[in-house]
């Protein structure tokens, strides 16, 4: 199984890339994280948020690994604790499907994509920069893995 993070946005500051890389390099070979950046659509010329999200949805769908479990990150998604994520990981690994975490653009994710997702998950009740969400998600995936391995990184 491979973990994918599909994120609308590119040209992130160096500290975002450094933070993200720090956690992805810690992951074991059997649970690698791959980032796929999706170029955001321009919201110019009176273009509606709906048309921007629909265009971004098409790009996201083209980048999704075939057959992957889709976990869409959304402010109205389910609140999971780190322990719940850690409990989900072994089941996902046994099922063998890749898992694609999807981070939307400035306007969020298209409703069609959210409806198609296997899980809607909220990272935080606070509004966060999308680049920071990449770092937080990578850290939480590493922490969840460390819990499943009784690794000392996580101290409950």
UniProtKB/Swiss-Prot annotation:
The keyword Kinase does not apply. It is found in: Cytoplasm. GO terms for molecular function: rRNA (pseudouridine-N3-)-methyltransferase activity. One of its GO terms (cellular component) is cytoplasm. InterPro entries: Alpha/beta_knot_MTases, RlmH-like, tRNA_m1G_MTases_N. Its EC number is 2.1.1.177. Keywords: Cytoplasm, Methyltransferase, rRNA processing, S-adenosyl-L-methionine, Transferase. It catalyses: pseudouridine(1915) in 23S rRNA + S-adenosyl-L-methionine = N(3)-methylpseudouridine(1915) in 23S rRNA + S-adenosyl-L-homocysteine + H(+). S-adenosyl-L-methionine binds at residues 73, 104, 123-128. It comes from the Bacteria. The keyword S-adenosyl-L-methionine applies. Its main location: cytoplasm. Specifically methylates the pseudouridine at position 1915 (m3Psi1915) in 23S rRNA. Belongs to the RNA methyltransferase RlmH family. PANTHER family: METHYLTRANSFERASE, RIBOSOMAL RNA LARGE SUBUNIT METHYLTRANSFERASE H. Homodimer. This is Ribosomal RNA large subunit methyltransferase H. It comes from Burkholderia vietnamiensis (strain G4 / LMG 22486) (Burkholderia cepacia (strain R1808)). The lineage of its organism: Bacteria, Pseudomonadati, Pseudomonadota, Betaproteobacteria, Burkholderiales. The gene is rlmH.
């Amino acid at each position: 199984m491979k973990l994918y993070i599909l994120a609308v946005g590119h040209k992130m500051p160096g500290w975002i890339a450094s933070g993200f890389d720090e956690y992805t390099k810690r992951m074991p070979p059997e649970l690698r994280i791959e980032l796929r950046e999706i170029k955001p659509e321009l919201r110019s010329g009176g273009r509606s948020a709906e048309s921007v999200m629909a265009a971004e949805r098409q790009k996201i769908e083209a980048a999704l690994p075939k057959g992957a479990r889709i976990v869409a990150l959304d402010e109205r998604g389910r609140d999971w604790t780190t322990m719940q994520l850690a409990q989900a990981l072994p089941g996902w690994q046994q099922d063998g499907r890749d898992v694609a975490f999807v981070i939307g653009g400035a306007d969020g994710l298209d409703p069609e994509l959210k409806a198609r997702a296997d899980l809607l998950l909220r990272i935080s009740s606070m509004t966060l920069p999308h680049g920071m969400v990449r770092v937080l998600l990578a850290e939480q995936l590493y922490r969840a893995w460390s819990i499943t391995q009784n690794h000392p990184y996580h101290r409950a």
